[in-house]
């Protein structure tokens, strides 16, 4: 969605297929290189063993906590669903680790009218039970390219702010 190159990252209709950390080198408008990193999802890998899920969890935690140059993490949430405990737990953990993050609600085009807003509002209310303020939120659709420009602007802003 971000690059407009459909074949850049392998996708699957089955959640939980990403099993490795994938790095994508990006050349900024200022000609400086930076990396967009795709981590395995933490929620859906129902077809793999508990041991494999634990290994992924440890790998993700280690990556997030030890990356001194990590500028921001994007937590992708399927907008078709109400808040899931695993998502709330992960976000809570990011807060405890003091990792900056934004939430990207995906697949907004797959919902019935009004469902995305209801689900996002429920998610926000759930977070505000524990958080004083909300992280930056984005509503996106890869198919319709909705939210793409807003997300790219946010990434550019982060890059400009944290670029050496």
Q: Model features per residue range: what roles?
A:
Residues 1-50, 157-164:
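Conserved G1/Walker A P-loop phosphate-binding module
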Residues 3, 61-68, 95, 124, ...:
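Signal for well-folded cores of large energy- and translation-related assemblies
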Residues 17, 41-43, 80-82, 107-112, ...:
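Conserved nucleotide-binding/hydrolysis micro-motifs of P-loop NTPases
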Residues 52-80, 92-104:
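Inter-motif core of Ras-like GTPase G domains
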Residues 82-98, 116-126:
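Conserved catalytic-core segment of NTP-binding enzymes
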Residues 110-164:
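Canonical P-loop GTPase G-domain recognition
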């Amino acid at each position: 969605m971000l690059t407009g190159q459909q074949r850049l990252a392998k996708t699957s209709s089955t959640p939980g297929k990403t099993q490795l950390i994938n790095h994508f080198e990006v050349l900024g408008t200022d000609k400086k290189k930076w990396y967009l990193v795709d981590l395995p999802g933490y929620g859906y890998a129902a077809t793999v063993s508990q041991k494999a899920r634990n290994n992924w969890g440890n790998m993700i935690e280690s990556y997030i906590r030890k990356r001194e140059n990590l500028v921001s993490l994007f937590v992708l949430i399927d907008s078709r669903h109400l808040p899931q405990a695993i998502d709330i737990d992960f976000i809570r953990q990011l807060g405890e680790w003091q990792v900056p993050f934004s939430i990207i609600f995906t697949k907004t085009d797959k919902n019935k009218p009004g469902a995305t807003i209801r689900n996002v509002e429920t998610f926000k209310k759930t977070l505000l039970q524990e958080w004083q303020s909300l992280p930056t939120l984005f509503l996106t659709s890869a198919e319709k390219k909705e939210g793409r420009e807003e997300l790219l602007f946010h990434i550019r802003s982060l890059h400009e702010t944290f670029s050496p």
